[in-house]
Regions:
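Active-site-proximal beta-strand/loop segments in catalytic clefts of secreted hydrolases
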Residues: 9-11, 20, 62-67, 74-75, ...
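Extracytoplasmic/secreted envelope proteins and their assembly/folding machinery
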Residues: 31, 36, 55-60, 71-75, ...
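Active-site SXXK
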Residues: 6, 12-13, 24-50, 120
Length: 153
């Protein structure tokens, strides 16, 4: 393994092997897991139309294609908007007892979205309890039909 920090664990979280697992590192697109978890916890209808997509399709695009714009829109359409979404993400992190994980934006583009390999295991374990995330993790490609609205003047 050539990664600077890593951790191998059983499904139950038992660590098999690791190196520098408690070092804080930028987590890039893994951020999208926390964004989607937070959006799903808000219990907004998955079939709500947001621009040309449903909320479920935006979740799929964020997870399967790692689409930054989809993650951003999901956060913007969170109850209370973007700011409340980021607050809710960090509240979820605190509930999980994660002290080294910090998120400042929903896509993973910021190097200031950070965590450790040890804390990421807990995030992945939580993510595995959401059927929508499990479904997306088993999917390598998606086909989404864009809906175009006709506007009359």
């Amino acid at each position: 393994i050539t990664a600077q920090s890593w951790l191998v664990a059983n499904y139950d979280g038992t660590v098999i092997s690791s190196e520098n697992a408690n070092e804080v590192r930028s987590i890039a697109s893994i951020t999208k897991l926390l964004t989607v978890i937070t959006v799903l916890d808000a219990k907004q209808p998955l079939d709500d139309q947001i621009n040309q997509y449903t909320r479920k399709e935006l979740i799929q695009l964020a997870l399967i294609k790692s689409d930054n714009r989809s993650a951003q829109v999901l956060c913007e359409k969170y109850p209370g908007g973007h700011r409340e979404c980021i607050i809710a993400i960090n509240s979820k992190i605190a509930q999980l007892g994660l002290t080294k994980t910090k998120i400042i934006e929903p896509t993973g583009l910021s190097v200031f979205n950070v965590s450790t390999a040890t804390e990421l295991i807990k995030i992945v374990q939580l993510a595995s309890t959401y059927p929508e995330i499990v479904e997306a993790s088993k999917t390598s490609q998606i086909k989404i039909q864009i809906r175009i609205r006709t506007l009359k003047q």
